[in-house]
Amino acid sequence: NGSGKTTLMNILSGVFPPTEGTVTFNGKECHFSSPSEAEQAGIAMIHQELSLSPTMTAAENVYMNRMPVNKLGLVNYKKMYADCAALLEKLGVSYISPKAKVRNLSVSEQQLLEICKAVSCNAQMLIMDGPTSSLTDTEVKFLLNIVNQLREEGISILYISHKLEEILT
């Protein structure tokens, strides 16, 4: 505790500017002034405190501020729900409905939705801060399987945990 893990993650994800040193990602020095800049560069962050809107659907949360639009500039809900369903299927959690309200999802399902949101941004690096702190042992195993799947797909994972057995998995 107190070693600067969260501060480092916030710098990498564009929440805070570094006061010293540099951030190099994919061989290039980066200066992110916002999380959206880090996201555009391929870095996504999942905070320990989930950042989902409980009154919105799973798909609306995944594509918040990036909802697909049609030629008239209106939200293309059909595409959004289909794209979200495909992402949920890819992660092996197709039992979560893209139309489900987040308030009706369990904590572990919300955590999986946060991962889905990061994957939807084509993240090359996924920063996870204590992702299992409120999950059961069964849910932890499932989440770690998804993390390993993402690693196999070439996504870098920065996984912060106080549980050493998770890090060694």
Features from the language model and the residues they span:
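Glycine-rich phosphate-binding loops of nucleotide-dependent enzymes
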Residues: 1-169
